[in-house]
Amino acid sequence: YIDLYQLHWPERNTNFFGKHGYEHDENDKDWTPFEDILESLKRFIDQGKIRYIGMSNETPYGLSRYIELSKNKNLPRMMSVQNPYNLVNRTYEIGMSEISIREKCGLLVYYPLATGALSGKYRNGQMPKNSRQALFKGWERHLNPLAMNAYEEYHKLAKEYNMTMAQLAQAFVNSRPFVCLLYTSPS
């Protein structure tokens, strides 16, 4: 069996990859309804193939709908959300954190180091050859001037407490009451 089966992306149009604001599209009707998804996942749970379910890259609307349906229709409950969260991307705190805490649906954090920027590897204009930022153009949202200034301040703060930037960033993420796990990986 699979301990935790996570839905990777919502099918419906929503604000992905750091896009601010939601732009509604009346023609966006070709996605599987929330209830149908939960019913499909329930079959796998009933067959013993999956123990728990979660989702990734979800919004407050999506998480709320899943929770409401699981309560009202006796369907499986989402146990986790896997979204980005770090010192420079705290959008999870707007709407999602309250739901996570009140509904006991923990955050599995990805990008706790802002795709490596909070490790300090991009300080002073550095761009390591095989880094994520060098390999994947279009990820520059973590290297904008405002973020770069924040990284310098975090570097000073970490140094003041005899820590690396990565240790500071991970300690911050781990201190949040809605976080249950964080993922880091080398790049």
Language model features with spans:
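Glycine-rich, positively charged active-site loop/lid region within alpha/beta enzyme cores that binds
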Residues: 13-26, 101-157, 179
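Glycine/threonine-rich phosphate-binding loop and adjacent beta-strand/alpha-helix elements that clamp
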Residues: 168
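Glycine/proline-rich, positively charged
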Residues: 1-82
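Active-site glycine- and acidic-residue-rich loops that bind
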Residues: 86-91
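Conserved small/polar residues in nucleotide/adenosyl-binding loops
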Residues: 183-187
